[in-house]
Amino acid sequence: MKKKMLEGIEQEVITETLDNGLKIFLMPFKNRKNYSINYMTIFGAAIDKFKVNGKVCTPPSGVAHFLEHKMFEQETGEDPFEFFSKTGSDANASTGYKSTSYTVEGINNIEENLEFLLNYVNSPYFTDENVEKEKNIIVEEINMYSDEPESRMYNESSKAIFKRHPMRIDIGGTEKSVRNITKEDLYCCYNAFYIPSNMYLFISGNFDVESILEVIKNNKLLNEEKNSVAVSVIRPNEPLEVNKKKIEIKLDNVVKPKMIFTLKISLKDLHFKDKYKFVLLTTFIYDILYGSASIFKEEALSDNLFTEFVASKMVIDDFLLIEFMAESSSPEKLKEKIVEYFNNKEITKDDVERYKKTYISSYVLSSDRVQSTLNGVIESVVDYGDVIYDKINIIRSITLDDVLLAKSKIDIDNSSLVIAYSKK
């Protein structure tokens, strides 16, 4: 067991790796009543090809999401959601491109809830019948999301950005791919990726560390000996250049045009803290140039270029995506203004110092919340490979030269624009 503090906020992080490879991260809070648990496998929709003991597997798209659904069906017939409801807790699960998480939040019964969580995630039960039954449910879910403008636009944006990467396909897959999923596909993926050495257990909040570790180490299903497997993920050779510069679509439920303008930036050869620092520097850039207090936003609003505007980022494999999402009657003009500001707007030392204070303040304030602390540690581990304990010191070390150097490495022309117009 190792103990280390998140610097600047004095939050302890206790880490331990079990003999079976499970990596545990505990963040005990003394001044909070609630807790949050996240049991995660590094298996998401972006993994669509892999080797198991030398054999290549290419399951249908959407299998990670399908697997998440089926984990809630137990051979005993017990419903995990019903169990957690009876203990006064909230349970959920989510599949992303990088990972799949099973979560529990509550105030009481943490040991009982943790035991049940470990048991059901380690008890797969897939049959031909229950797999077939689930297909209609998931297809209905896919069709429901395909009618939502934002969901459809994200899918089109991924196709514009990526040429070969699995992110081109929606997390849930397609109706055709879902119809082709078999129980053998589910067991193949489960046995390859739902193994302790590929999983993480994050717990934050009010709990006794020794009692929690005892529950984990004594859980029979988690610690039973399993057949060893050699798994290697096969990544596509994805080029840096975007696949398409522009896509226009027409949708029924769009009134004013919507747009997603995405930059594709290489993170190749950047690892751990260097990778984190570069992503942080890009955050400085888009907050300074396009944030709520920027001249850009003031001018764009004055020119009626948007009614909604937000920027976000995503790290996926060797790429950083920066996305500008807006509702705009003139999406082409708005995109041109974004590019113009990137190329011509000066970033000053005062800008950098102001946002350093903003980021540090935000980090300190969020550290007092159980869920925020948990999410911060999870993001560090999933995106950068380990906990980054000295985030505050990295923020403090940022200089104007750092920001300008990072900006010089961004090719804003390596971008795509997706516009959704009304069909009417």
Task: Identify the residue ranges that each predicted region occupies.
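His/Glu-rich zincin catalytic helix
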Residues: 1-79, 187-297, 415-424
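Charge-rich, well-structured scaffold segments of protease-associated domains
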Residues: 74-232, 272-277, 293, 298-424
